Amino acid sequence: MNSSSTLTVLNLTLNASEDGILGSNVKNKSLACEEMGIAVEVFLTLGLVSLLENILVIGAIVKNKNLHSPMYFFVGSLAVADMLVSMSNAWETVTIYLLNNKHLVIADTFVRHIDNVFDSMICISVVASMCSLLAIAVDRYITIFYALRYHHIMTARRSGVIIACIWTFCISCGIVFIIYYESKYVIICLISMFFTMLFFMVSLYIHMFLLARNHVKRIAASPRYNSVRQRTSMKGAITLTMLLGIFIVCWSPFFLHLILMISCPQNVYCSCFMSYFNMYLILIMCNSVIDPLIYALRSQEMRRTFKEIVCCHGFRRPCRLLGGY
């Protein structure tokens, strides 16, 4: 948000023309591209689907003791971050509907505060997602290259402390975002954080997969080699690769929008790109919808627990039968 903003995420979803730090900030859009409009119902539908899916993920992790491991705890943290995006967008959509239909009449100053909260929730969500993905990456790295010592290095207590630190840091970032919403340096800091964590994760992946093949050959000769554990570890690494790839695809346009908004807000071509901001919000919400599908696709245990919760909650005997398939 800058000094000229009156409404950011709210106005963007309504296709309004005010400027904002998370908004389109396109003053020359009439010379380039008209702002892309997306129905409010699309935002609400994706938000509700994402909310239900990620509640299901968290419920599965809580319900199934076989999922009580550091990796799935970090997956739960990622699900909470995804759920935060869906909640903020659903709340935003309801607020827009109430304002448009005059069911809610509030002062512009209070609307600005609501906007700040929405922006802060997006900030918290993206930082929490990045930190959770980084934690999963480190966990998979330890699992693959320190398999025999994994349970001594990554305990449930340590993973809990890591998650607590992640969310303390993310909430602090959100508070700073609200306090200094008029400063562009907050956005620069967010962009820098995104690319820094992305660099660390990609570097870790390159290192991990370059060494993985030689490492597998070396430990295969060991009498203590556990092929099942190794396959499980590699499967977890592939799952994380999919999560990271989807995260990059869905969030990169949003951060490119922020970069262009700061560097060339008056440029016609930059303005044209920024006119599609609503689509970038949709991509962010799609990320939170796709992640649970990846969990279900890659984890048989997660699929079984989903089936128990969705199809036969409260009917334990049929659930056990279904779990056998």
From Swiss-Prot:
Lipidation sites (S-palmitoyl cysteine): C311, C312
PROSITE patterns per UniProt: G_PROTEIN_RECEP_F1_1, G_PROTEIN_RECEP_F1_2
Keyword Cell division recorded: no
Chain positions carrying an annotated carbohydrate: N2, N11, N15, N28
Transmembrane segments: 38-61, 74-97, 115-138, 156-179, 187-211, 240-265, 274-297
GO CC field: plasma membrane
Side of membrane Cytoplasmic, spans: 62-73, 139-155, 212-239, 298-325
A molecular function (GO) term: hormone binding
Main location: membrane
SUPFAM superfamilies per the UniProt record, alphabetical: Family A G protein-coupled receptor-like
Stretches of the chain found on the membrane's Extracellular side: 1-37, 98-114, 180-186, 266-273
Tissue: Skin, adrenal gland, skeletal muscle, bone marrow, spleen, thymus, gonads, uterus and brain.
Pfam family, one: 7tm_1
Biological-process GO terms, alphabetical: adenylate cyclase-activating G protein-coupled receptor signaling pathway
Membrane topology: Multi-pass membrane protein
Entry keyword set: Cell membrane, G-protein coupled receptor, Glycoprotein, Lipoprotein, Membrane, Palmitate, Receptor, Transducer, Transmembrane, Transmembrane helix
Subcellular location: Cell membrane
Reported function: Receptor for MSH (alpha, beta and gamma) and ACTH. The activity of this receptor is mediated by G proteins which activate adenylate cyclase. This receptor is a possible mediator of the immunomodulation properties of melanocortins.
Family, as annotated: Belongs to the G-protein coupled receptor 1 family.
Name of the protein described by the UniProt record: Melanocortin receptor 5
Species in which this protein is naturally found: Mus musculus
